[in-house]
């Protein structure tokens, strides 16, 4: 459960991203594919090479979904319900990949925004991404 401080930290960091969300999403996906080769089995139809159009496109989708989540912190399940259905029933993404991508997102954000990435912000973002991952995997059962 995100505390009021966590919510404030998430909103503060998200407001600093500016128009770079898609870029950071693609960078995080690239990090995940390089660091965890087993994640390359999904999406099997993607060109997972660095800078590919598919990685950039999916990076934008990731960033947009996280922006939606960051603006609906009090109702993540409602805000992400359709996305949860998509990942569980159609795409069938391995649930472990959400945790791996979350870590890669944290690394990417820390690299680009070191001043904003305080220990408190790091902890809050980690909780936020874990909450998003939990919602996205909730319909796998």
Swiss-Prot record:
Cellular-component GO terms for this entry: blood microparticle; haptoglobin-hemoglobin complex; hemoglobin complex
Modification sites for Phosphoserine: 3, 35, 49, 102, 124, 131, 138
Keyword check for Heme: yes
Modified residues (Phosphothreonine): 108, 134, 137
N6-acetyllysine: residues bearing it: 16
Residues binding O2: 58
GO molecular function ontology, one term from the record: organic acid binding
Residues modified to Phosphotyrosine: 24
UniProt-listed GO biological process terms: hydrogen peroxide catabolic process
Summary of the tissues where the protein is detected: Red blood cells.
Span of domain Globin: 1-141
Disulfide bond sites: none
Transmembrane regions: none
InterPro entries found in the cross-reference section: Globin (IPR000971), Globin-like_sf (IPR009050), Globin/Proto (IPR012292), Hemoglobin_a-typ (IPR002338), Hemoglobin_oxygen_transport (IPR050056), Hemoglobin_pi (IPR002339)
Record PTM N6-succinyllysine, positions in chain: 7, 11, 16, 40
Binding of heme b, residues: 87
Keywords noted in UniProt: Acetylation, Heme, Iron, Metal-binding, Oxygen transport, Phosphoprotein, Transport
Known function: Involved in oxygen transport from the lung to the various peripheral tissues.
Annotated family: Belongs to the globin family.
Record text on subunit structure and interactions: Heterotetramer of two alpha chains and two beta chains.
Protein name: Hemoglobin subunit alpha
Originating species: Peromyscus crinitus (Canyon mouse)
């Amino acid at each position: 459960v995100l505390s009021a401080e966590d919510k404030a930290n998430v909103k503060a960091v998200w407001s600093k991203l500016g128009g770079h969300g898609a870029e950071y999403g693609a960078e995080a996906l690239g990090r995940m594919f390089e660091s965890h080769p087993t994640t390359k089995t999904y999406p099997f139809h993607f060109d997972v090479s660095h800078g590919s159009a598919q990685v950039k496109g999916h990076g934008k989708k990731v960033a947009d979904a996280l922006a939606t989540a960051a603006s609906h912190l009090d109702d993540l399940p409602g805000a992400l319900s359709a996305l949860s259905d998509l990942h569980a029933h159609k795409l069938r993404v391995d649930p472990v990949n959400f945790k791996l991508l979350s870590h890669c997102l944290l690394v990417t954000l820390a690299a680009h925004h070191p001043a904003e990435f305080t220990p408190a912000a790091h902890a809050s973002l980690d909780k936020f991404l874990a909450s998003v991952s939990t919602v996205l995997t909730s319909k796998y059962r």
